[in-house]
Amino acid sequence: MQPYTAPSEIALRQLDYFADKHVLVAGEVEDRFPIELRQYCASVSVFTTHYGYYSQLKAYPEITRYFGEQLTADLNADLILLYWPKAKQEAEYLLAMLLAKLGTGTEIVVVGENRSGVKSIEKMFAAYGPIHKYDSARRCSFYWGHCVHTPAAFDIEQWFKSYAVDYQGHELTIRSLPGVFSHGEFDLGSRLLLDTLPPLSGKVIDIGSGAGVLGCVMAKLNPHIELEMTDISALAIRSSQETLVANQLHGHVYPSDMFSDTGHHYNYIVTNPPFHSGLETSYSATERLLAESVDHLASGGSIWVVANSFLKYPPILEQAFGHCDIAAKTNKFAIYHAKK
């Protein structure tokens, strides 16, 4: 984990708000601040939808950690520290879910970068109670609020967006939760990748499955493949599972930080990899994925990657595989292919 993010630094200036509280941390938290916060609080729990962060917290037994698309466990918390997520709809989702769980009387601290749209909390929280900004620093804002109105019961079904994808005469229903890549649309990069793929057979893994578009189209066109779909986001995992069910398709969907929890000997690795971490652009995870992919392929297996054309991924694949082919290219996207 890196040094403290700017939202954590502004929270660090306001430790009195957390003194002796049972704090539940949620949202776009990326650093060790919850561990330091434990010194000032009665207890600290972390609910995260990010499997990588959840895995890193395993080293800190003083923190109770929860991973999933929904917090189902019973816990003692009287204050939520919400790190504002990059998607406004995800913030609405987290508020509705967590406040329905904890109820009236719950205090909330919201921290986030101003460019992320954290100011939206002022209107968003109105249904729950008062909230005000109490600090600004490092281009971030610090809000404190109090839930005084009874939150509505939370029903996750109300948060799915369903939309149709028509591909080669097959109409698929895609189910997507807030915060999932390409929420509510069939992105052009995924379409180009599907247009370029050969007929598939054997073990196929879709890494960074999002709402499950790639995996489900591959399963529809190649019904005999053994399909796995992974993502670092619990919201994406649930979305991919729902998309499979909606289309009566089969596959194994599970959380993994790139190859952290996957198997080996895949015949095909197919990926539309993410390159955003929070609000920042980050390529390190994808570069690691490309470099390690050769170790997870069967002999004769291949990787197929879609990426923005300007990204310098071919040298990484060339170093790992000894070659890299550009299978397709547009003004915006390129399809890279390498075979073991």
UniProtKB/Swiss-Prot annotation:
<dbReference type="InterPro" id="IPR007848">
    <property type="entry name" value="Small_mtfrase_dom"/>
</dbReference>
<comment type="subunit">
    <text>Monomer.</text>
</comment>
<dbReference type="InterPro" id="IPR002052">
    <property type="entry name" value="DNA_methylase_N6_adenine_CS"/>
</dbReference>
<dbReference type="InterPro" id="IPR046977">
    <property type="entry name" value="RsmC/RlmG"/>
</dbReference>
<dbReference type="GO" id="GO:0052914">
    <property type="term" value="F:16S rRNA (guanine(1207)-N(2))-methyltransferase activity"/>
</dbReference>
<dbReference type="InterPro" id="IPR013675">
    <property type="entry name" value="Mtase_sm_N"/>
</dbReference>
<dbReference type="InterPro" id="IPR023543">
    <property type="entry name" value="rRNA_ssu_MeTfrase_C"/>
</dbReference>
<keyword id="KW-0808">Transferase</keyword>
<dbReference type="GO" id="GO:0003676">
    <property type="term" value="F:nucleic acid binding"/>
</dbReference>
<dbReference type="Pfam" id="PF05175">
    <property type="entry name" value="MTS"/>
</dbReference>
<keyword id="KW-0698">rRNA processing</keyword>
<keyword id="KW-0963">Cytoplasm</keyword>
<comment type="function">
    <text>Specifically methylates the guanine in position 1207 of 16S rRNA in the 30S particle.</text>
</comment>
<dbReference type="GO" id="GO:0008990">
    <property type="term" value="F:rRNA (guanine-N2-)-methyltransferase activity"/>
</dbReference>
<dbReference type="Pfam" id="PF08468">
    <property type="entry name" value="MTS_N"/>
</dbReference>
<protein>
    <recommendedName>
        <fullName>Ribosomal RNA small subunit methyltransferase C</fullName>
        <ecNumber>2.1.1.172</ecNumber>
    </recommendedName>
</protein>
<keyword id="KW-0489">Methyltransferase</keyword>
<dbReference type="GO" id="GO:0005737">
    <property type="term" value="C:cytoplasm"/>
</dbReference>
<dbReference type="GO" id="GO:0070475">
    <property type="term" value="P:rRNA base methylation"/>
</dbReference>
<keyword id="KW-0949">S-adenosyl-L-methionine</keyword>
<comment type="similarity">
    <text>Belongs to the methyltransferase superfamily. RsmC family.</text>
</comment>
<dbReference type="InterPro" id="IPR029063">
    <property type="entry name" value="SAM-dependent_MTases_sf"/>
</dbReference>
